[in-house]
Regions:
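Active-site neighborhoods and metal-handling regions in enzymes and metal-associated proteins
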Residues: 1-596
Length: 596
């Protein structure tokens, strides 16, 4: 079926069910940013393939809301679908909730699958629409009823992460979380975030593309640990090891019946912004719900000593692979046909030559020319174009290794570039360098540093429509909270104090629709600096080890300090990566990291 046909089929079903508006978020049952094929309902009903967005379907209109990363892509993919694009955050554009409040009339019915909407959002919708006496239909998966060839739920084999990689045993992590439960006087801890469960139990999976997580729910008490998952995904030995730590595995969907039977008056700790509304609605009404951030969130974000050491090794391996790729690309772009897709395949080949490489940490973005202006462009067979010996190609890629997860962007010059391109290439690079060089007093959050990255662009009256940085997991999700770099304060997602061990991306960019796009990204590790009479000072350690392309830089735009920052970084890259290169690559890297 075409998107138009799917919309028509959904509207027929909505009429049968008495539903006036149907809400389709991107989420799975766990609030994941990226979802498995089974959960791609929003993609199915709209045709939009981006990782973020919400659809609303009514009898006479349909809308899609997405953020600035995807404005160009969404506009292109929605052509001819009758679906209207709402650019979230733009002046005059209503939010999904504002739209529903305006469009839904007295006593109408709003529908959604309660497993894909968080308890917090469901409560907000009920409060917002209560004055109109709006009813809610949340028990039916209407998309599932019309999606005849829907993929099955993923059931990939589970692996255990040895303590030499994790740095802390499962038993120690469990004990620490139970201590937190006791301090909060909680009887039950409900954990549904997939990366948090994987971190806590030192397990990894492959149930979401590029995200090494296991579809599961976890219920913890002071005596029990119940893991609800696909039992067949666990080898017998892993089951035995989990049971040795008190973890028993039950069928995935039985979690809903279990929470219904939680003892009367229990104090249940969970995060309403992450746990789905159907699960929370199944909890006995007389239970006391303690709505707090997951107890695992901060310990997961603060990498331990072993994880920090391993991440350094992962970034050396990744630096070797990406450096080899850039050398290969610049050497061969005029000699053979290289397309966006074939370049991505070649980079994967270089990464796969590294020991302990497990796969991409997200779908690679190899965007040439005008495609680079699409922030999260993803080449397909239909959009794939050849690279030429002119202009720039943006390569935003990453890998999973047993030693950790990487995420790097380099804008690579393939031939002549204009002064305009150099101007913005240099401004973005200055922002990257200035943020990474920050030294600060303990207690700062990511909000304190965003200006360092955006400043050179703001001086030009320019900006970019995405955050400057996100947290990165350890062999987990490449996007991990709560740390990040942004300038807007988000009340629902307060910026945490930056702690030693937090790993964050530093990725300013500039995008000119129809012309070019530039992004420079390194990962920086928060570290302690000296302690003085004024308190503890902190700094960032750059882990990414790949040269920035000197051919795109206008040194005259840079201060002496900024040039020194770049030269010092390039010296470290050369010293670190050279031992792993052949003679041709060494000679090339010597030139690529020369002083300016």
């Amino acid at each position: 079926m075409t998107v138009k046909e799917r919309l028509e089929a959904l509207r027929i079903l909505m009429k049968e069910k008495g539903v006036d508006a149907y809400l389709v978020p991107t989420d799975d049952f766990h609030g994941s940013e990226y979802v498995g094929d089974y959960f791609k309902c929003r993609k199915y009903i709209t045709g939009f393939t981006g990782s973020a967005g919400t659809a609303v379907i009514m009898k006479d209109m349909a809308g899609l809301w997405t953020d600035g990363r995807y404005f160009i892509q969404a506009a292109d993919q929605l052509k001819g679908s009758t679906i209207e694009l709402f650019k979230s955050g733009e002046p005059g554009v209503p939010t999904v909730h504002e739209f529903l409040k305006e469009k839904l009339e007295q006593k109408m019915c709003l529908g959604f699958d309660g497993r894909t909407v968080s308890a917090k959002e469901a409560e907000e919708l009920q409060q917002l629409l209560g004055e109109k006496d709006i009813s809610f239909s949340v028990d039916d998966d209407l998309i599932g009823e019309i999606w005849k060839d829907r993929p099955a739920l993923s059931c990939e084999p589970v692996m255990e992460l040895d303590v030499k990689w994790a740095g802390e045993t499962r038993a120690d992590k469990i004990a620490k979380i139970r201590e937190q439960m006791k301090a909060k006087n909680a009887d039950v801890f409900v954990l549904t975030s997939l990366d948090d469960i994987a971190w806590l139990l030192n397990i990894r999976g492959n149930d979401i593309h590029c995200c090494p997580v296991v579809l599961s729910y976890l219920i913890m008490t002071d005596t029990e640990l119940r893991l609800y998952a696909n039992v067949s995904a666990f080898a017998e030995k892993i089951c035995e090891n989990l049971e040795a730590n008190g973890v028993k595995i039950y069928p995935y969907n039985e979690v809903y019946s279990y929470v219904q039977a939680i003892p009367s008056g229990s104090r249940i700790l969970l995060s309403k912004s992450g746990v789905n509304s159907r699960l929370v609605s199944n909890i006995p009404a007389d239970a006391v719900i303690l709505d707090e951030v997951n107890l695992t969130l901060l310990p997961k974000a603060v990498k331990n000593f072993t994880e920090m050491e391993n991440e350094r090794l992962a970034h050396i391996k990744d630096g070797v692979a990406v450096t080899k790729f850039i050398h290969w690309l610049k050497t061969n772009v005029e000699k053979e046909t290289i397309t966006e897709l074939s370049a991505a395949e070649k980079l994967y080949q270089f990464r796969s030559e590294q020991e302990h490489f497990l796969g991409d940490s997200f779908d690679p973005i190899i965007a040439y020319g005008t495609h680079a202006a699409i922030v999260h462009y993803s080449a397909t067979k239909e959009t794939d174009i050849p690279l030429e010996a002119k202009g720039m190609v943006l390569a935003d890629t990453g890998g999973h290794y047993l030693e950790g997860t990487t995420d790097i962007t380099r804008t690579i010059v393939l031939g002549p570039v204009s002064n305009k391109e150099k101007k913005y290439f240099t401004a973005v690079l200055r922002g990257n360098l200035n943020l990474a060089a920050a030294k600060f007093k303990y207690g700062c959050t990511g909000l304190n540093f965003d200006y360092l990255a955006r400043g050179p662009l703001w001086e030009l009256g320019e900006d970019y429509n995405h955050g400057t940085g996100h947290g990165v997991g350890y062999l987990l999700n490449v996007h991990e909270g709560p740390n990040g770099f942004r300038w807007k304060n988000l009340p629902d997602h307060p910026a945490p104090v930056l702690e030693e061990g937090m790993l964050t991306s530093d990725e300013p960019g500039y995008y000119l629709e129809g012309e070019f796009g530039i992004r420079h990204e390194n990962l920086v590790l928060c570290r302690k600096a000296e302690k003085t009479s004024f308190g503890q000072f902190m700094r960032f350690e750059t882990l990414t080890m790949v040269p920035f392309d000197l051919e795109g830089i206008d040194p005259k735009q840079m201060s002496d300090h900024e040039r020194k920052l770049l030269n010092d970084y390039h010296h470290k890259v050369y010293e670190t990566i050279t031992p792993y290169l052949n003679e041709d690559e060494k000679e090339w890297l010597k030139q690529a990291t020369r002083e300016i």
